Amino acid sequence: MSDEILNGAAAPADAAAAGPAFTIEKIYVKDVSFESPNAPAVFNDANQPELQLNLNQKVQRLNDNAFEVVLAVTLTCTAGGKTAYVAEVQQAGVFGLVGLDPQAIDVLLGTQCPNILFPYVRTLVSDLIQAGGFPPFYLQPINFEALYAESVRQRHNESASLADSEPAGNA
């Protein structure tokens, strides 16, 4: 039946016939960790906490039309030179991309997918920190479009410098 609906979306054959499509297939926690190696003494530390945030994104092609995107965040809090806590979250999603050119796929994977995953990361990091006995920390919005544009610039500069450093052919 060509009008059949699966989980609120058009059947796969219909989606391919309808043209380009971007779908969220699944969102899940891939890895999560919270450590507070100096608890409970750290709760009485009067030093100003220092926070360091590391953000990373990995993309893996699962098949012709599906990609796994993993948004990884590590938040480290130190106070008085001692680690108060380390919260690590890897939030992942499987995204369907059908009928799109490689450049459009690259843009979606680098901007829209992390934008979709980020609210899940923010909530999980905040919940972990509070469950560890610390005041909540709310990750501020991240401009993934700007990060993507910067990574494209870096890739372009690297490929240009590689082309410049290649030896000229023998004449």
UniProtKB/Swiss-Prot annotation:
Instruction: Show the GO cellular component annotation of the record.
Output: cytoplasm
The subcellular location is: Cytoplasm
- Listed GO MF terms: unfolded protein binding
What the entry lists under InterPro entries is as follows: SecB, SecB-like_sf
Would the keyword NAD be found if you checked this record's keyword annotation? no
**Which domain of life does the UniProt lineage start with?**
Bacteria
Q: What does this protein do?
A: One of the proteins required for the normal export of preproteins out of the cell cytoplasm. It is a molecular chaperone that binds to a subset of precursor proteins, maintaining them in a translocation-competent state. It also specifically binds to its receptor SecA.
What is the name of this protein? Protein-export protein SecB
**Organism, scientific name:** Xanthomonas oryzae pv. oryzae (strain KACC10331 / KXO85)
